Curated annotation (Swiss-Prot):
HAMAP family: 16SrRNA_methyltr_G (MF_00074). It comes from Pseudomonas syringae pv. syringae (strain B728a). Belongs to the methyltransferase superfamily. RNA methyltransferase RsmG family. Specifically methylates the N7 position of guanine in position 527 of 16S rRNA. This is Ribosomal RNA small subunit methyltransferase G. InterPro entries: rRNA_ssu_MeTfrase_G (IPR003682), SAM-dependent_MTases_sf (IPR029063). NCBIfam families: rsmG_gidB. Pfam families: GidB (PF02527). GO terms for molecular function: rRNA (guanine-N7-)-methyltransferase activity. It catalyses: guanosine(527) in 16S rRNA + S-adenosyl-L-methionine = N(7)-methylguanosine(527) in 16S rRNA + S-adenosyl-L-homocysteine.
Amino acid sequence: MSSMVTPQHAQELSTGARELGIDLSPAQHEQLLAYLALLIKWNKAYNLTAVRNPDEMVSRHLLDSLSVVPFIEGTRWIDVGSGGGMPGIPMAILFPERKVALLDSNGKKTRFQTQVKLELKLDNLEVIHSRAESYQPEVPFDGIISRAFSSLEDFTGWTRHMGDVNTRWLAMKGLHPDDELVALPSDFHLDSAHALTVPGCQGQRHLLILRRTA
């Protein structure tokens, strides 16, 4: 384990995952901590996340990402505006049988993501350096997820072409974004909304699941 990742971090991850109802294998636990170590190391130079304190990263990044695990269905996912790789990298670690793509227009961030893919040997992870509106997938994704990426209007507008009526759009938010829902494009609707409790995180967390009507 990296010297930057402490036994307290390891314990917080184990306990938090259990509270979320997630049974991490020893290998997954180790991979998540290896990812955390890379995030701490690269964040100093690359500004991957505004969270500077490593002691806050387990709850605000790892456990926050794991909180959406019960809602992941289907085999092909894309994390849009992935930044430091949340929630896509934890998803790829948890679901080795699913394909997860990370999309970001920032070259520093995609370089970091590629390094994580190589070091953690995540064969199911694809890193895409592109703007959302420019990226053209060959087939629609089963799920499109974003974490604090943009407004719901922009998120759906920029990624509409990546999915179809069978796709689920998952938007990870803080407060329930009532004002953003009003501005949702007419061909999208709210399928369900879920208040999430993230161990160690203060403040509200919500997951909104959206679908296309046509």
